[in-house]
């Protein structure tokens, strides 16, 4: 299944806020309609919607998400928490969380077009897994910096999660540590996602 490129508001109206996909928020009325239908939802649909929420927020294909679930299942610790940490430490998500891109698709475009460096080297793979002490910067070119500046000016100035530091005047971000689950920027029940995939195998 390919990455979703359809109407974004349609997705947030059904699944709730997906800040990685779009800054738009569902109207309160649509939230109430979803809640009124929640009693009719099967357990399968509840798990499916949590999985879809994760997939659309991080902009993943079905195959990519399944691969992350399998990697998380082989790691020590809670599979759900490891899954979220893996997704949060992707380069495209780190750029989004730093405020250097307004959405994860926007961050992915910056990476694909070779505007981003990690530790002084161009990285053009959005799924690159960032590590503690990684330094993320833009290419020292006017166009690259103008793009980042535009994103930073238009992004809402939210409190930065403690696993990251931003030096906006230098167009530089620093990964301080692996993200703690309490700093995840998405309202999600990761256990339901793991359950969804465990029942598919």
UniProtKB/Swiss-Prot annotation:
Region (Disordered): 15-43
Molecular function (Gene Ontology), one example: rRNA binding
Sorted UniProt keywords: Chloroplast, Plastid, Ribonucleoprotein, Ribosomal protein, RNA-binding, rRNA-binding
Any one GO BP annotation for this protein: ribosomal small subunit biogenesis
SUPFAM superfamilies (alphabetical): Alpha-L RNA-binding motif (SSF55174)
Primary subcellular site in the record, as a coarse category: plastid
Entry-linked CDD domains: S4
Stored Pfam families: Ribosomal_S4 (PF00163), S4 (PF01479)
Keyword Cell membrane: no
Residue stretches making up the S4 RNA-binding domain: 89-150
Cell location: Plastid, Chloroplast
Similarity comment: family membership: Belongs to the universal ribosomal protein uS4 family.
UniProt-listed HAMAP family: Ribosomal_uS4_B
Function: One of the primary rRNA binding proteins, it binds directly to 16S rRNA where it nucleates assembly of the body of the 30S subunit. With S5 and S12 plays an important role in translational accuracy.
Protein name stated in the entry: Small ribosomal subunit protein uS4c
Organism in which the protein naturally occurs: Drimys granadensis
Gene coding for it: rps4
